[in-house]
Amino acid sequence: VTRSRGWGLPLVVLLLAVAGGAAYLLVGPDDSDDPFASYCDAVVDHREDIGAARSAGAETGLLRALPAFEELADEAPEDIRDEWRIVVDRVSDLRDALDDAGVDPASYDPEKPPEGLSADQRKAIRTAAVRLGAEDTAAALSGVEQQARDVCKTPLSL
């Protein structure tokens, strides 16, 4: 007696494919395949901190948000890494200039700098502040905010 093998192998392959697909649907997709998963998790984790920090004002808020920005820059996917580097570098430069001068960012007034502040220290602070407010920094910050909305489906801050 000869058995027909015409449908045997294709039927087994079809059944295995259906079983595999059903298992995938039950378990769900694996986040390890998503290159943005850890970055988006970090965005969600830091939203409240960034929002609270930024409510303190332009430069001061960015200074307070710097630790969160640094973590997000470390988690950032390749396509937004350059923008994060600009943001972190510019905020860090202002922080460093203020720290080097021993100046409290919250109370610093460039029109009335503290006594004892040298011309070089004032210039370093002014230069860092101008670079932080520059068009390329604003574009980088806008880019990371847009990335959070588009890819992570959440704003960068509350």
Residue spans for each PLM region:
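N-terminal targeting leader peptides, primarily classical Sec-type signal peptides for secretion
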Residues: 13-16, 20, 110, 115
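Alpha-helical segments in soluble extracytoplasmic regions
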Residues: 46-106
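N-terminal export and membrane-targeting signals
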Residues: 1-14
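Short, flexible coil/linker elements and helix-boundary hinge sites characteristic
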Residues: 1, 27-28, 99-102, 133, ...
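C-terminal amphipathic alpha-helix
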Residues: 42, 46-55, 106-158
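Short, intrinsically disordered, charge-biased short linear motifs at domain edges
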Residues: 19-30, 133-142
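Immediate post-signal-peptide N-terminus of mature secreted/exported proteins
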Residues: 8, 22-68
